[in-house]
Amino acid sequence: MSLASRFLALALCVALYAADKPVSKPVEKDVPRTELHTLIVPGAALKFNFPELTVDRRGSLAAGNLKLPANYDKAKSYPLVVWLGGGEGGNTPDGSFLPAGDFITVGLPYPKGANKPAQANMVGDYAKVWTYQRFMLDEIAKVIPNIDRSRSIIAGFSNGAHAIDGMLRVSGGPKLTEYFGIFIFVEGGGTGYSSLGELPDLKGKLAYACWGSEKGSNKPNTSFLPAALKAKGATVIGSEMVGVGHGFSVSEQRKIAEWLEKVALAKK
């Protein structure tokens, strides 16, 4: 075998070894909240851990994932957009229903054990949920103080919308309306257990409630929300998603984005 052939064979062996060798991935390190301010740059993705709180409904460390806008400037103020997921929830932000613009987005979880008494798979102890999430919001504001609460949005699907309805009605202490000016209910809220108690004064607030038209939707409950919210002074849009069951259609996401851009945020 010639010298060139030997070098070629050796190179092939090295290449095959490299291909079989596992690729090392960078280790993600959790950063304490007290140090997160050092990571604030335009477009940053920040994970807020809350080890002092009970675990979330999935049994994981209480945490919220937050995304800063690409044009973030500490000298400007921005609306915070909180997303509350359906089912067991989660902590991933969702901006699918937002118009073009600069928003701080975050996903917040539900605490373990905050169940509806007769149905453990449903969030139901809204006072506990609000105490849990209010702590998170206050801690986020310590790191990112330039949040414009009057333009901030809380939105949720299914269990998330139930939770918004329920938290609005929690009496005593700081209220949900002190943190947000816009409320979006998707296929949730208006149920016999989420609507227990009185709604607060909603004058100057805006809300959008939507529900599916098909079997399996929350139409029998959510469709009653617009009238209840209007009775307390809110400016409300009620919308039926034609051909949709228990879901959040892309067409409805676009309608909400247009409403936010031309109405809700334009008024703020």
Segments (PLM) and residue ranges:
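Gly/Ser-rich "nucleophile elbow"/oxyanion-hole loop immediately N-terminal to the catalytic nucleophile
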Residues: 70-77, 120-159, 174
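Active-site machinery of serine-nucleophile hydrolases
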Residues: 80-137
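Short glycine-enriched nucleophile-adjacent loop
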Residues: 161-174
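Active-site loop->helix "elbow" adjoining a glycine-rich segment at hydrolase catalytic centers
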Residues: 87, 158-161
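A domain-start/cap signature at the N-terminus of enzymes
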Residues: 19-78, 159, 227, 237, ...
